[in-house]
Amino acid sequence: MAHKKAGGSTRNGRDSESKRLGVKRFGGQNVLAGNILVRQRGTHFHAGENVGLGKDHTLFAKADGQVVFERKGPRNRRYVSVRTVQ
């Protein structure tokens, strides 16, 4: 009779799905209201003018316009704004 010794168990073999975080629309790009600008965990980027903040800290455009990234304030925070075109 052919025999094969039992293989040992392993504790590996798991991994979580990637969450596809990051900047989705870059500076200078034209966007429509509702477009997602940044997906993030926490406020790595802050909401500037014409930008909303979702409950999962997603930044989205509130108006049509052009994306602008800037640093402001005493803490030099990064803000994402949408400048509307008149």
Swiss-Prot record:
Output the InterPro entries linked to this UniProt entry.
Ribosomal_bL27, Ribosomal_bL27_CS
Q: What Gene Ontology terms describe what this protein does at the molecular function level? A: structural constituent of ribosome
One Pfam family linked to the record: Ribosomal_L27
Instruction: Give me the ranges of the annotated region Disordered.
Output: 1-23
Q: Name one GO cellular component term.
A: cytosolic large ribosomal subunit
Which keywords, in A-to-Z order, does the entry hold? Ribonucleoprotein, Ribosomal protein
The lineage's top-level taxon is Bacteria
Quote the protein name from its UniProt record: Large ribosomal subunit protein bL27
Q: Which organism is it from?
A: Alkalilimnicola ehrlichii (strain ATCC BAA-1101 / DSM 17681 / MLHE-1)
Gene name, Swiss-Prot/TrEMBL: rpmA
